[in-house]
Amino acid sequence: MKALFRACRIGKVMLRYRLDTLLDGTAVERWLRLAKPFVPRISAEIVEQSRGRRLRLALQELGPIFVKFGQILSTRRDLVPQDIGDELVMLQDRVEPFEGQTARSIIETALGKSVESAFAHFDTVPLASASISQVHAATLHDRRAVVVKVLRPDIEHQISDDIALLKSLATLVEHTHPNADKIRPREIVAEIETTLAAELDLQREGANASVLRRFWEASDDIYVPEVIWSHTAERVLTLERMYGIPSDDIALLDASGIDRKALSSKGIRVFYTQVFRDNFFHADAHSGNIWVDSDPARKSNPRFIVLDFGIMGQLSQKDQYYLAENFMAIFHKDYRRIAELHVEAGWIPPHVRIEELEAAARSVCEPYFTRPLSQISLAEVMMKLFHVARRYQLTLQPQLILLQKTLLNIEGVGRQLDPELDIWVVARPVLERILRARYSPRHALKELNKRLPEIMTHAPDTPRLIHTWLVQQVESRKQNDVYLQQIRALAMTLQGLQRRVVNAIVGSGLLVAAAVLYGLHPDGLYLGTIPVWSLISGCIGALALFSAWWRS
C-alpha cells in the first residue's frame, strides 16, 4: 500500500511538470492522461520551461533519492539526450539535516563507544547535509581537527523501497516506450542501485581515500585528507579536516593571489595521471569536491584538495590501452586508426565496415579542428564519437562512461579557472610521457619481476602441463580422425540414398508415362498391341525402380 501511494505521488508530480510528454505514444502516457483531472492546473511558468528543467524540478520535489537518481543519470550521456543531461548536472544534493543527537547515537552504535570518549569535541550542528549522509565538525583528543561523515538514519530502507519502485517503473517503460531499447531503463536502475550501495558503505569510501592518498602522498599537485581508521566504521567516516577555497569561487581565488592558469593545467595533468598511471581516478570531480589550498606559500604553485571518495573509477588494462590509443589517434587526426581501435577494443561488432566508421569519425572530429585550440574539448569529441558509434551497436563498459563524464567535469573546472586553457597542448605531452613509461622495456621488466614469484611457483609444473597438453592434442587429433571417417561414411550413405530416391522418382515417372501412352494409343510403331514408346518407357522405369530397390 505504501508503494502504491508513493507511485501515485510520483505520477502526480510527473503530470504537474508535464513529464507525460516524455512518454508520448506509450501506454503509460494514456494512463497518466486519465489522472489529469485530479491534478491541479499546470502553471504557465512550468509549461514554458524546457523538458530538461521540468525533469530536474520534478526530481528535486520527489526527494533526495530521486535527486541522486538524476545525478547518476546525468553521467550516462550515452543514454540521455544532451539537453536533459545538461540540466540534470545542475541537480543539488542538499536536503534538510537530521538531528545532531541522532547523529551522536549513530556514531556511538557504529564505533561501540560514547562520543565523549571518541572525540574531545563534537559539533551537533552539521557543516553540510546531503541525501545519504551529513558531515559534522569534531576534534580528537590529540587536538587534531576532523570531520565526521554520518549516514542518515534508516537510509537503507528508504533507498531499498525507492529502488524497488524504480525497477517497477523501468520494467513498465521497457514494455511500453518505443525507444526502450536505446534508453535501457533497467540497466540505468541497476547502475543506480550499484552506485548507491557503494555510497552506503563509508568504510569503503575510506579505503578509496586511503588508496588515493598513497598514490599522491609526496605530490605538490593534490592533497588527500588522512582517514582516521580508529574512528571509522560502515556508517561513520572520520577524515582530517581540510580548509580551502572551492575551485569555482573565482573571486576568492583571485583575491588570494592564486595562479589560476597554473592550477587549470595542473588539473588536466593530474586527471590523465590518475587514469593512465595509477588506474584509479576520482569520478565525482565537480567543483564542490575540488578545493584549492589557501596556503599563501602556494600562490605560484597551487595545490588541489580532493574531497568525497564515494565514486572512484578504474579501467581494465585492455580499455586503458585502447582509450589511450584513441586519444593519440585523435591528436594525430588518424580517423582510420580511430575506427580500427573501436572494433579491436570490442566496443563495436567486427561486421561493421571500417570505412563507414572512418567516415563517421571524420565527420565528428573535423569540425572541432577548425576551432581555436582553447575551444577544443577532448571530452566532447569522445562523447560525440561514442554517440555516433551507437548507430553501429556500440557497447561500452560502465567505467568508460564514468570516465567520459569525469573528463567532462575536469575540463569544465579547468575552463572555469582559465577560459583560454588549451587542453590538447596540456594533455598530449602528459599522455605521451605516461604511455612511453607504461609500455617501456623497464616497465615490462618491472611487471615481470612482480610476477616472478608466481612464475617460479608454477615453473615445476610446466613440463607436466606441456606433456598433458600434447597428449590432449594427440587424443583430440585421433578423435577428430574417427569423427572424420564417420562423417565420410555418413556422406557416402547420404549420396547413395540420394541416388536411390532419384532413381525411384524417375522410375515411377516413366512407368506412369508408359501407362498413359498405352491408354492414349498414339500414332507410330507398335509391338503387337503395345506402342513402342510405351514399352521403352516401361522398361527403363522398371530398371530404375529395380536399381533403387536393389541398392537398398
UniProtKB/Swiss-Prot annotation:
Its EC number is 2.7.-.-. One of its GO terms (cellular component) is plasma membrane. It is an enzyme of class 2 (transferase). InterPro entries: ABC1_dom, Kinase-like_dom_sf, UbiB, UbiB_bact, UbiB_kinase. It comes from the Bacteria. The keyword Transmembrane applies. The active site is at D284 (proton acceptor). Keywords: ATP-binding, Cell inner membrane, Cell membrane, Kinase, Membrane, Nucleotide-binding, Transferase, Transmembrane, Transmembrane helix, Ubiquinone biosynthesis. One of its GO terms (molecular function) is ATP binding. Pfam families: ABC1 (PF03109). SUPFAM superfamilies: Protein kinase-like (PK-like). It is a multi-pass membrane protein. It is found in: Cell inner membrane. ATP binds at L127, A128, S129, A130, S131, I132, S133, Q134, V135, K149. The chain crosses the membrane at residues 501-521, 530-550. Is probably a protein kinase regulator of UbiI activity which is involved in aerobic coenzyme Q (ubiquinone) biosynthesis. This is Probable protein kinase UbiB. It comes from Xylella fastidiosa (strain Temecula1 / ATCC 700964). The gene is ubiB.
